[in-house]
Amino acid sequence: MLQATTSLAGILRAHKVWLEKSADGRRANLHGITLNDQDLHGVLLSRAILTNATLLDANLSGANLAGAQLDNGDFERSNFAGADLTACELSGANFGGAWLSNAALSEASIRGACFRRAKLSRAQMLEVTIAESSFRECDARAINCHQSRLFDADWSESDLTQAQFYHTRLQSSRFTSVIAESMIFTGSKLDHCDFTRAQLEDARFLRTEIVQCCFHDGRLIRADFRDAKIRGCDFTRAMLDGARFGNSQLTMADFRGTSLRGAREMSADMLAQSLTDHRTILPNGSQGPYRKFSGAEHGR
């Protein structure tokens, strides 16, 4: 172990010199290395090669890994709190149970990766590209995921309270049973996403385009859909009490069994173009189905 540690120290020194653009330096190539349980807090490995590396239960808190290649690495349960992973290649990597609170992951490329049960609270994920990756059961409170692209990302059963997804494109992604009070999707596009049983109280969907998404059994009390474009969405048995719809374009929504009690700024055309039934509670508190010219679109 001492020999391995000494060798690693030499690699880190040479890498630091390489980053300074000195001819005496050498880029750290840690491909396939195993460094389980190592204390590497604050380590400088920016632009290093760690493909297929195994660092289980390691401490990399505050580490600088910006631009590093971590493809197919196994970092299960490791501590990356406050680490800089900006523009990293993370495809195929395993961060299951890892600590990434306050970490910087902006501009990272994440495909086929696993972040299940990871701690991502207050992480910065601006302009990331995520595809076919699992973020199930994560603690992602107050995560910032602005101007990113997510395809087939699974956030099911995660805590996304006060998460911010401004101007983000989400396609075929799953948010089933998430806790996401006050989550923000302002200016985003949600295409064929699943929010079944999601708790989205006070969520903000201002100027959001929502296409064929499922909110079945969801809690969207006081959600804000002003200026949104909502097309072909399933809100069956959802709770939309007190939700706002000012200037939104709402077409072909399924409100069967939905509670719209106290919903604000709904128009007769919105409800006339949507499905309602005898289980629907309309904005004025009356029972559905909605009948045009009944005035039931006006909340009490």
Please report, for each region that a protein language model flagged, where it lies by residue.
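Tandem repeat scaffolds
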Residues: L2-G10, K16, E20-R300
